[in-house]
Amino acid sequence: MLTKSPYRCPGDDSVIHHACAGMLSHWSRPVDEQVARTSLGETHVLSVGPATGRPIVVLAGGDLPAAGLRDLADSFDPSRRVILIDLPGLPGASACTRPEGNVHAAYGRWLTEVLDALEIGVVPILGLGWAASVAAAITDVERVEKLVLAAPLGLVPRARWHRALIPGLQWRNEPNFENTERYLRALAGSGFEPDGATLRWSCRVGAYCTSLAGMPRIGRSLWQRWKGHAVELVVGDQDPLVHVAPLRKIADEIGASVEVVEGAGRLLPLEAPTLLAEEMFAPIR
């Protein structure tokens, strides 16, 4: 069951917000921070690159907050304005408010409100993890120049039995460095080594945050709106939570393309940041 807050106890959000600030201190480029006030509470927005640059919107999806997406932000053309957003209701720097009732309709309105608050018209959007289905739920699909959904959750059923299941339970039960590292390695592709900042962040998520397993899947009617639009799904061939075959099936429903990343798991912003940045502007295959 999906809880009303991503945090285990009152006050835990302050620990996570502090962790986001700590990750942000390691960025080498100047970062602009602002808060958009929306129907789901305060939404934390990071921006890098020239203020006059053409914008790209990236929605953080739970595995990492916006402040943890430095490698991805640095992989885009430096002339672009990269806007990274923490979703309310997911671990990150935004409000802990989760929608009641129709989750995707509420998040779709929220995303439109954020674009309006930032005075953004039509823009390419990259949705990561759980934010993939949120990006696909935007109220007006005409606001999206190209939609890229990476390591997407909320589109197809999650795998029930997978290599990250037991490490994930151990991490939830005792989120020390050893269990956290084992869990991250199980999520990622072979040979992945998490850095210290990612380890510390994931330890805190295990200790202070609830599971996102109860997040619902996007409704068929919302998904079908994307027929004829530029949509691409990106998934690692070693992603333990999402299998490629059902993603291909749902992509075929709307004429979307699927890019399978060899040797990668589900931590694509860390495993393949350059590829993700390139896919935002690659022609649909």
Predicted segments with their positions:
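An N-terminal hydrophobic leader/cap segment in hydrolases
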Residues: 1-35
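Conserved HGGG/HGGXW glycine-rich cap/lid loop of the alpha/beta-hydrolase fold
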Residues: 16, 41-92
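Catalytic histidine-centered segment of alpha/beta-hydrolase-like enzymes
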Residues: 264-277
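Gly/Ala-rich beta-loop-alpha elbow adjacent to hydrolase catalytic centers
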Residues: 127-135
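Flexible "cap/lid" loop of the alpha/beta hydrolase fold
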Residues: 136-174
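Active-site loop/oxyanion-hole signature of alpha/beta-hydrolase fold enzymes
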Residues: 83-124
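Conserved alpha/beta-hydrolase catalytic His-Asp/Glu region
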Residues: 158-163, 173-230
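Conserved serine/cysteine hydrolase catalytic core
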Residues: 210-251, 260
